[in-house]
């Protein structure tokens, strides 16, 4: 009985130590060499159309948080561009080439830095796993 309880207790601990993301194979819809340029072209267009939030302090804070997270991520390319969107919805997104968009609604809704970091880490995982390049 005690052994069964110990097994149940240790199982989540062992699972938590294995933090590798699943590998669904290489994306081939967009070559890695073109991602950066596609992302920057998309970003130029996006900035012309979307309500961009211009807040230097918030920009610096968000960039610092994302760059800190990127240090321990599986990203091959760490040239990241953070764009703050003036939108009250709770949302963030990732675009090829290291573009991460963050709605100010997400920042306002986050109860603390850890909650915001978890969403930003999720977006970095989209980039590292190249989900957009899978067609």
Please provide the spans of the model-predicted regions.
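Bacterial N-terminal signal peptides
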Residues: 2-9
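Peri-catalytic and regulatory segments of divalent metal-dependent proteins
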Residues: 16-135
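N-terminal signal peptide c-region/cleavage motif recognized by signal peptidases
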Residues: 11-13
């Amino acid at each position: 009985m005690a052994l069964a309880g110990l097994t149940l207790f240790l199982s989540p601990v062992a699972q938590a130590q294995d933090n590798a993301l699943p590998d669904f194979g290489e994306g081939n819809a967009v070559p890695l060499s073109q991602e950066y340029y596609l992302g920057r072209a998309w970003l130029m267009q996006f900035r012309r159309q979307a309500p961009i939030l211009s807040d230097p302090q918030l920009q610096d804070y968000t960039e610092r948080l994302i760059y800190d997270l990127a240090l321990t991520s599986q990203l091959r390319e760490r040239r990241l561009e953070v764009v703050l969107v003036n939108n009250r919805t709770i949302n963030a997104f990732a675009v090829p080439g290291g573009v991460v968009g963050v709605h100010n609604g997400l920042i306002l809704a986050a109860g603390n830095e850890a909650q915001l970091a978890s969403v930003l880490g999720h977006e970095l995982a989209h980039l590292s796993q190249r989900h957009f390049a899978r067609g």
